[in-house]
Amino acid sequence: MYPSAMSILTLKVNGRSQQVDVDPSTPLLYVLSDDLELRGPKFGCGLGQCGACTVIVNGQATRSCVTPVSTVGSNEITTLEGLGTAEKPHPLQQAFIDEQAAQCGFCLSGVILTAKTFLDRNPRATDEQIQQALASVLCRCFGNVRMLNAIRRYAGGRTA
């Protein structure tokens, strides 16, 4: 096995330019968690199938565990931490707080960031459309109506 060549890459993460010295084939998830110490995206399956590692890259929900860091280039990367702060959460994060929608929290990065990107493109989505958009995010507690209520609240306060 040959050692991989390291490269200094500049990433724009949560509105800040960050330089990292990494193997260009390293999954974005590892750079975000190990090098930049961001804990929003989680390692779930490592295959891009569960959604726990979801981040937003140029407005698109992206599975960071299967995205080589070199492919994001100078694109804007947003993690769950980049949406808001503890003092001033993003309205979707606040809706999850208000609805007490989080249980274990492992899937929250996937649920919240997927919902945000979907609703940014489809602000008048129906409950069925929202559920379809989130079908690729695995969550043992997504049957909990509180998550859907939080997403509805963010999308404009629709009721069931």
Predicted region positions:
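Signature of N-terminal electron-transfer/Fe-S-associated modules in redox systems
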Residues: M1-A160
